[in-house]
Amino acid sequence: MTVRDGIKIDVPWCNSLFHKEYKSEVASITTPRQLTVQKIENVFANEWCLRHHYLKRKLYIARNVSYGIFKNGLCFGVIVFGYPVWTQYKGVVPPHHPGEVPELLRLSTVSGLPKNTESFFCAKAFRMLIIDWKSETGFIPKVITSLCDLSQGFNGSLYRALNFTEHSRGKIGRPSNPGGKHGKWGGNADKTVAEKIMFTLKLGR
């Protein structure tokens, strides 16, 4: 097994959720405080999302900042923030510059973790993002945005627990189409844009 910067990077993705070491570690975690959060390579985060996030596809955005949540070098989840692809969005850009508004694009954790692990993970990542986003983009992040996909059974409870505010709702963004194309390229079979909620969180409050 290869370890780089304390991360076991070659645990087989195809069976990592059922890997003996993973199962043993998950069973040993009784509180989120046993876990650590650290910045990770976007390639690692993308591979995780391809295998374990419900959308089953990689992100192709040039400027991302990604974090993983770990115990004993094993990754139990990732969160990915990206530079927004839109140049304006009423009430968000303006007044802010797009570079000040990172979008929370992916959040994925394994099952069986203690209650409130995702909230713990997000809160840690938000604090780290203030420094790491500026290093990546040159901008100080002011607001985090994220889309909650109602068509996939999500209701926004995690966002509300993290003090996000509902900004708007409707057929926002691209089709969900888990496992398939989601843009206008490549013959996307799902042309219907899903009902979503855009949530925003002001940083530095």
Where are these regions (language model features)?
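Short amphipathic alpha-helix that is part of the acyltransferase structural core
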Residues: 17-61
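Compositionally biased, charged N-terminal/linker segments
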Residues: 28-30, 78, 115
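A short, polar/charged loop/turn motif at coil->beta-strand junctions and beta-hairpin connectors
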Residues: 31, 43, 75, 96-98, ...
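Acyl-donor binding region in acyl/amide transferases
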Residues: 36-39, 63, 82-193, 198
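Short beta-strand-to-coil "C-cap" segments at the C-terminal boundary of structured domains/repeats
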Residues: 200-205
